[in-house]
UniProtKB/Swiss-Prot annotation:
Ca(2+) 1 binds at residues 281, 283, 285, 287, 292. This is Calcium uptake protein 1 homolog, mitochondrial. Ca(2+) 2 binds at residues 472, 474, 476, 478, 483. Belongs to the MICU1 family. MICU1 subfamily. The lineage of its organism: Eukaryota, Metazoa, Ecdysozoa, Arthropoda, Hexapoda. The gene is MICU1. It is found in: Mitochondrion intermembrane space; Mitochondrion inner membrane. SUPFAM superfamilies: EF-hand. SMART domains: EFh (SM00054). Disruption phenotype: RNAi-mediated knockdown results in lethality. RNAi-mediated knockdown in neurons shortens lifespan and severely impairs climbing ability. RNAi-mediated knockdown in the developing eye decreases ommatidia number and disrupts ommatidial array. RNAi-mediated knockdown in neurons and, more specifically, in alpha/beta or gamma mushroom body neurons, impairs mitochondrial calcium entry and decreases intermediate-term memory after conditioning. Does not affect olfactory learning.
Length: 525
């Protein structure tokens, strides 16, 4: 029975899988009719396909860009814009002065002959003057100064300008410890493989003066090694034998404690020192001993922005250890039994200021006659003004243009006399205010009279003329009193009175104090 069922099932499956024979194949008429239907269907499908492809092509042409299969043409406006941007870039980076020198080389009339020494010097002077005039006409901010045919300073590039801005922020906002470590350049070995960092007097000046760039290769914790015990190695500090810096000991070098003390001396006026001395002069004789002087120095240092900002850093070795022992010996004698008078200390302060001014003057490289240019003198006056770069360059260019042809230069004595006049700037401010209230104009003769009356110093006509050129904006030969006084006060104080922070913490402290002391309004309801 099962065998029979198996055979039936296999036969049924074979019948299902066997191809079915069409009867229409055996009839020729039916074959012709079927072929006609197939041709009609194929023609109809071809027409539909052609129509749909045409519609698709039309739709792609109207709405799309063939999906990136066809190269896209750049519009002419875009090409012109790209050419314009590229031209601006090339104009900005190209050294046009060099291009001008290449296209128009200088040809001397006596090129075939060797001129004499005098003619050579005169020729160099004339060519250098013409180069200076061309540079001043081309750029207002050119920093080229000529002394007897010698070029002193080249134009400051982008990299140097950014470094100077960074160093100015260090001077303004950093702690005294970091300022000292950045601008100090000397490292002296001591016992047990340890080293102590020192400043030279030039480093001390650089740490205070904005715009003075630290030499390449020297910076934060980067120093030159110097061994005082080495016979063949000597430091040339360009100081006089009786310099005040040699009284500090350490071969005329400045330690961190000396740095703090000297900044304190420079940042406090004579009047404030006199008051501090009288406060600690218990017997009223005008003298103080060593212990009283330590208290005076501590009190005065705490009143300065530098003193409030300083924190001892034991890990760097920069801790304030009090007044230098060599200075203590200079003030109070080897046995510490002498008294320090206010006159002796003020003489020390005046001598320190005079040496700093001399270093500034010598840094401008005076000519053979010992004079610096009027533009250099203007730069020294405006060093601490805090002007924007364009405003400062405008004033300097006005001075260069004014004294280009008949400049006599500024001697060292005229320079020191003018800054002796500035040491009495508060009294000068009072005197000029009286003139202004009385309705009198402040001309050059008035300023000379005030200097003679207040500071007991005779200002030369040429120095006063340069000062009026700097601060006389409208060329009416009248001094702008407020601007002159504010700039000169900053110059005397060398920016040391400015706070060493951005003011954000002070503002937040004021906000918290106000919120703490103010009663909420809801409590009054």
């Amino acid at each position: 029975m099962s065998v029979l069922r198996f055979l039936v099932t296999r036969q049924a499956l074979a019948a299902l899988t066997r191809p079915r024979t069409l009867n229409i194949i055996q009839n020729p008429a039916q074959i012709a009719y079927a072929s006609t239907l197939c041709n009609q269907n194929s023609n109809h499908n071809a027409k539909d396909l052609t129509k749909s492809s045409a519609n698709l092509s039309l739709m792609q042409t109207r709405g799309h860009k063939r999906f990136g299969h066809q190269e896209e043409k750049t519009p002419s406006v875009t090409k012109y814009f790209h050419m314009f941007i590229l031209s601006l870039f090339l104009i900005s980076v190209m050294d046009w002065g060099k291009v001008k020198r290449m296209l128009t080389p200088k040809v001397d009339a006596d090129a075939g002959q060797r001129p004499s020494s005098a003619a050579d010097v005169n020729g160099e002077d004339k060519s250098s003057e013409s180069e200076s005039e061309d540079s001043e006409d081309e750029e207002a901010g050119s920093d080229l100064h000529l002394h007897e045919g010698k070029k002193i300073r080249e134009k400051v590039g982008f990299r140097e300008r950014k470094i100077i801005e960074y160093e100015n922020r260090i001077r303004q906002f950093s702690t005294p410890d970091k300022v000292f470590r950045y601008f100090a350049t000397i490292q002296v070995p001591v016992a047990d493989d340890r080293h102590e960092v020192y400043m030279t007097p030039t480093d001390f000046l650089t740490s205070m003066t904005p715009g003075m760039k630290q030499p390449d290769g020297l910076g934060l914790d980067q120093y030159r090694r110097y061994d005082p015990k080495s016979v063949g190695e000597q430091l040339n500090l360009h100081l006089e034998k009786n310099s005040i810096f040699y009284k500090l000991g350490s071969y005329g070098l400045i330690t961190f404690s000396d740095y703090i003390f000297l900044l304190t001396v420079l940042s406090i006026s004579r009047r404030h020192f006199e008051i501090a001395f009288r406060m600690f002069d218990l017997n009223g004789d005008g003298d103080v001993d060593c212990e009283e002087f330590e208290m005076v120095a501590t009190l005065v240092r705490q009143q300065t922005s530098m003193g409030t900002r300083h924190r001892d850093h034991a890990n760097t070795g920069n801790t304030f250890k009090g007044v230098n022992s060599a200075l203590i010996t200079y003030f109070f004698g080897p046995n510490m039994d002498e008294k320090l008078t206010i006159e002796k200390f003020l003489d020390f302060q005046e001598q320190l200021q005079r040496e700093i001014l001399s270093l500034e003057f010598e840094r401008k490289e005076p000519n053979d006659e010992g004079n610096i240019t009027e533009a250099d003198f203007a730069e020294l006056l405006l060093a601490y003004a805090g002007y924007p770069l364009k405003k400062k360059q405008k004033k300097l260019k006005r001075v260069k243009r004014r004294f280009r042809d008949h400049g006599k230069g500024i001697s060292k004595q005229d320079y020191l006399d003018f800054f002796h006049f500035l040491n009495n700037i508060n009294d000068v401010d009072t005197a000029l205010t009286f003139y202004h209230i009385a309705g009198a104009s402040i001309d050059q003769q008035t300023l000379q009279h005030v200097a003679k009356t207040v500071a007991m110093v005779n200002l030369s006509d040429h120095v006063v003329d340069v000062v009026f050129t700097i601060f006389d904006e409208n060329n009416d030969n009248q001094l702008s009193n407020k601007e002159f006084i504010s700039v000169m006060k900053n110059r005397v104080q060398r920016g040391l009175e400015k706070p060493k922070d951005t003011g954000f913490l002070k503002m937040m402290r004021s906000v918290f104090k106000c919120a703490k002391e103010t009663k909420p309004v809801l409590l009054d309801i």
